[in-house]
């Protein structure tokens, strides 16, 4: 019995793999986001409670997406195995598995913000393939379908004891004409030298499983090849981009800036909901500006590059960043200023929100007043001297200095709608986050590292502090809860970037704690009270402990 159950579970897994492979292959022709695993993953992300999302980002960091997809894959494998077992006992019940999974895939695909009818095709095709194979593929212990090879020889199914034949439960291994057992103690009765009627042969099971496995490998390989071709095409599109010199270049970094002021592109944090990175073609990309405007605008990528680009050093930070966390970075950005585009469109009276929409359906709501107050809000096309990487929004992303990313930094942007906050809540606002999200003043100790063991003597404590668009006026350090001591501020690029700081500490032997706080350009000092990132950013003093030998 155990062996047959495992064989049936294996058949369920094989059938599910075939269905997924076909769905993935078809998704390469529709779009990557239509793949059932990705669509279901997106639905899970959208439906997960905010505390769960925050826990995932805090615990797994940038590995949260692969782990989510892996978890969905494991759940699918479990359901597939159970489906195979159910199909062995009751074929109709077994078909319920592909039906349920197919409906889940279709529902997830069609409820994505940017879904079209074609997005349902991969899940439908995968479910149909799985159901068809499950019905036609011989299962151990189940009679073969009418037009599949019969079990005239070497039966692996459980037969009823026939009159005049072998006894049920015989211990021997039967040949074509005898009652036998497949090793679990259940005999397959025969009559007058004939095999058990209607049961699949081992040869049929192996042959059909091999054919299905081969087809699955071919479909999966085809999907992989097509994905690689699509990625290569997108990469060529990006490599062909030649960014023009900025009409307003960034100022050179002042003397005295320490190494590491700018974050290398490959180390820049990434926090978003995209389970597959969109790879857009600059030749077909368009930006549509509409809504409460007098003159709707549509621009191509080439037209955007002709709009007199600006280049600025700007620090970005994520609202999910915990006190002392890593989700903050500084880069040199190149882009088209957003304010002239909005003014050219003619914003109508009463409009107070600009909603940016990405290619994969994300919505970001930004106060129009903020975009028009003179800050360097832009539609960025370049990062650290090169076109945007795909993971950071290629070909175009929105960037608003002084706001957290969820309120002013839409990646893969394709649409801008002028509207009101009363009329529309953006993605994160619908999930309880604040409508308006100016970056909170923050500071971090980067060295020494937490729990470090260092020798006694002069020690340089160093880190960064940021309050984009307000600037940093002072940074202070406290040792072991003692008085606050002023740290030295290094030169910086502008109020839109972080400030590097350092503090000379005469370290003495023993355990110690170090704490940092910053004061922004308005004179407001970081509050000591610890708060989680939800709903508008974390607060509190970054504190580390270490041992001096």
Sequence positions of predicted segments:
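Membrane-embedded alpha-helical segments of integral membrane proteins
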Residues: 63-149
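Intrinsically disordered, low-complexity terminal tails and inter-domain linkers enriched
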Residues: 140-197
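Juxtamembrane/transmembrane-helix boundary motifs in multi-pass membrane proteins
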Residues: 3-7, 64, 114-118, 199, ...
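Structured, non-membrane catalytic/scaffold regions adjacent to prosthetic-group chemistry
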Residues: 25, 29, 34, 77-78, ...
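N-terminal secretory signal peptides and thylakoid transit peptides that target proteins
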Residues: 195-213
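Hydrophobic alpha-helical topogenic segments used for membrane insertion/localization
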Residues: 103, 128, 209-219
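Membrane-anchoring hydrophobic segments
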Residues: 1-92
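Secretion-targeting segments and adjacent low-complexity export tracts
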Residues: 205, 215, 220-232
């Amino acid at each position: 019995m155990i062996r047959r159950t495992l064989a049936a579970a294996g058949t369920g897994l094989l059938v599910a793999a075939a269905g997924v492979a076909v769905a993935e292959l078809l998704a390469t022709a529709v779009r990557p986001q239509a793949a059932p695993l990705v669509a279901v993953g997106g639905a899970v992300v959208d439906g997960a409670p905010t505390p769960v999302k925050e826990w995932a980002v805090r615990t797994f960091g940038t590995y949260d997406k692969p782990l989510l997809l892996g978890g969905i894959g494991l759940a699918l494998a479990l359901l597939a195995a159970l489906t195979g077992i159910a199909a062995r006992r009751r074929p109709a019940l077994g078909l319920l598995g592909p039906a349920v999974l197919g409906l889940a895939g279709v529902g997830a695909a069609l409820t994505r913000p940017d879904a079209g009818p074609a997005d349902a095709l991969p899940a439908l095709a995968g479910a149909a393939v799985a159901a068809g194979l499950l019905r036609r593929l011989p299962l151990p212990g189940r009679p073969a379908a009418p037009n599949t090879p019969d079990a005239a020889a070497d039966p692996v199914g459980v037969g009823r004891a026939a009159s005049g034949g072998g006894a049920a439960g015989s211990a021997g291994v039967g040949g074509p004409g005898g009652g036998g057992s497949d090793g679990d103690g259940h005999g397959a009765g025969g009559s007058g030298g004939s095999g058990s009627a209607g049961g699949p042969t081992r040869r049929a099971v192996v042959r059909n499983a091999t054919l299905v496995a081969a087809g699955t490998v071919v479909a999966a390989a085809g999907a992989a090849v097509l994905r690689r071709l699509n990625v290569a095409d997108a990469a060529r599109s990006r490599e062909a981009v030649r960014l023009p010199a900025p009409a307003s270049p960034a100022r050179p970094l002042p003397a005295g800036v320490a190494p590491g002021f700018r974050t290398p592109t490959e180390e820049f944090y990434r926090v978003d909901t995209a389970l597959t990175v969109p790879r857009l073609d600059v030749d077909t990309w368009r930006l549509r500006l509409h809504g409460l405007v007098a003159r709707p605008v549509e621009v191509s990528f080439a037209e955007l590059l002709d709009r007199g680009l600006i280049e600025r050093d700007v620090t970005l930070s994520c609202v999910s960043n915990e006190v002392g966390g890593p989700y903050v970075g500084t880069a040199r950005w190149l882009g088209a200023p957003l304010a002239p585009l909005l003014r050219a469109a003619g914003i109508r009276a009463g409009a107070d929100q600009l909603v940016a929409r990405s290619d994969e359906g994300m919505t970001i709501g930004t106060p129009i007043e903020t975009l028009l107050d003179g800050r360097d809000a832009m539609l960025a096309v370049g990062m650290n001297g090169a076109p945007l990487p795909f993971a950071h929004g290629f070909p175009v992303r929105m960037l608003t200095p002084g706001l957290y990313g969820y309120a002013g930094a839409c990646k893969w942007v394709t649409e801008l709608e002028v509207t009101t906050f009363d009329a529309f809540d953006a993605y994160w606002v619908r999930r309880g986050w604040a409508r308006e999200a100016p970056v909170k003043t923050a500071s971090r100790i980067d060295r020494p590292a937490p729990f470090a063991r260092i020798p006694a003597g002069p020690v340089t404590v160093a880190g960064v502090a940021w309050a984009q668009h307000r600037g940093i006026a002072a940074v202070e350090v406290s040792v072991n809860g003692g008085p606050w001591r002023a740290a030295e501020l290094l030169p910086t690029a502008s109020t839109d970037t972080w400030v590097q700081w350092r503090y000379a500490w005469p370290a003495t032997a023993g355990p110690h704690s170090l704490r940092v706080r910053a004061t922004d350009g308005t004179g407001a000092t970081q509050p000591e009270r610890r708060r989680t990132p939800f709903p508008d950013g974390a607060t509190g003093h970054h504190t580390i402990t270490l041992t001096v030998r």
